[in-house]
Amino acid sequence: MTTINSEKPTSSDKAPPKMPGALPLIGHMLEFGKNPFNYMMKLRNTLGEIGEFRMFHQRMVLMTGPEANEAFFRAPDTQLDQSQAYKIMTPIFGKGVVFDAPPDKKDQQLKMLMPVLRDKPMRGYAQIIVAEVEQMVADWGDSGEIDLLEFMKELTIYTSSHCLLGNEFRYELNEEFAKIYHDLEKGVNPLAFVFPYLPLPVFRRRDKARARLQEMVTGIIAKRAQKPEKSEDAFQLLIDARYDDGSRLSPHEITGMLIGTIFAGHHTTAGTAAWTLLELARRPEHMQAVLSELDRLFGADGEVTFQSLREMPLLENVIKEVLRLHPPLIFLIRKVMQDFHFKDYTVKAGKYVCTSPRVSHRIEEIFPEPEKFDPERYTEARQEDAKPFSWIAFGGGKHKCTGNAFAMLQLKAIIAVLLRRYTFELTDAKDHYQDDFTQMVVQPVSPCRVRYRKRQTMSDTATQASEAGTAEKTPTGESFRIVIDRELCQGHATCMSEAPELFQVDDDGNLTVLQENPALDLLNKAKQAEKYCPTQAIKIQLK
């Protein structure tokens, strides 16, 4: 683990090297704004794993690579503050909500939403997502063309709102909610990081949409209060939630947290789903391999279920490779509240530090031939992502995206259903499809057109691969040890579903290991818990 120290300086205590070429007043903003990724890659190639640049008056320090990422993600909030860095979201989430709330209040708010992302409800989301995809393609016919990104944006609004927000947003407020969400989404752009309240049309529409959504939320709360039965969704969770002092959430707070929920479930997933099909369409050999995996798993009439979605190693590796090359968030930011030390360098309080998944994912020493699309990087034979904090598409540490399991479930379900029915081809040259860096969340440049064709052949005799001969041999020994990284554990309770004899998670998300030295007959269950833990907080050690 990389050593950081928020109190004592290192022996050298020198400032990070600075990027040359800063212009008066605007610093490096012009070059950064043209293409943030190219600029950050240039900084890494020029200065190494840590270096400083300037955006207007803000001094930023970029840290990349596994060691730098670990220092960044494991730093305490008192030293590197996530909330102070994301004031850009205050106009959207609202005053006093999530990033604008004091640390203790923010932690309470985030904990209120955790139950909808736990393992038990997750098992029901698979069928909802499958049904939504099937409904979207019901009238496609044998062939046609679509704007893939726009299709995925519409689809993931439906899947996310249906799974997480409730029926009112999915069915009753469909068109108006989609318009409101679009205006909120457009309000998140790089300019808002520096000047979030400029009197620009895009920001005026953002604020108007936020106010209208709060009106809608207030109305739904009143209607739900008249119903004897309660819904089981994030909305109802927030209506019923209480702070530690017993007070309820206000409609203003509920609105902001619902926006945060849908942003997490939709904002990044649409682009990743589109890129997954684009990358497969670029490479027929990879497309065929994924189709073969799906045919073996489902045959002609097999049902896409929660369990089957967990057993798609090839498709999962394809998605991981897409997220390596096209992470939706190209940089993550923290404000330095106390001097931050990394190796021989000290970043003074008041500056900002950031890390870039996109840059870290292109370090050749970690990922050879980094620009090559190669899903086999993640196979057991290679494990190029084995080094901690090398693959950080979902962040890391205690602030790792709590919805990462939902995101992977949603992505695999969407791609699996689509590819069981259709194949996809590019309508334009391969290099036409590029990332759009004009928004804070990176997606393919629009329009993003593809051609679909109904699959004509599928092996009717394809069956799920036999497990014969693949079962793990029981190791020799007397017991094994379970190690929990408490900083990574977020209380998803997947481990409790897989091995209730070994793990217990309470309503607040606190994990208890029930047996310190379990017998070997529980090893396979423990390994399942380790395998499916969304945050990789569990490690099994044989004695």
Q: Which residues does each PLM region occupy?
A:
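Cytochrome P450 catalytic-core helices
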Residues: T268-M287, L291-E293, A405-R420
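Cytochrome P450 heme-thiolate "Cys pocket" and heme-binding signature region
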Residues: I259, A264, F306-Q307, K343-Y345, ...
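N-terminal membrane-proximal hinge/A-helix region immediately C-terminal to the signal-anchor transmembrane segment
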Residues: T2-K95, F99-Q108, R123, Q127-Q135, ...
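Iron-sulfur cluster-binding cysteine motifs and their immediate structural context
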Residues: T494-D507, E530-K543
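Cytochrome P450 heme-thiolate monooxygenase catalytic core
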Residues: N5-P17, L25, M40, D81-K87, ...
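Conserved cytochrome P450 K-helix E-x-x-R motif and the immediately C-terminal K′/meander segment
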Residues: I26-G48, E215, G219, D301-K343
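Cytochrome P450 proximal C-terminal region
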Residues: T3-I4, R44-N45, V133, T156, ...
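Conserved cytochrome P450 K-helix/beta-meander segment immediately N-terminal to the heme-binding cysteine loop
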Residues: T355-Q383
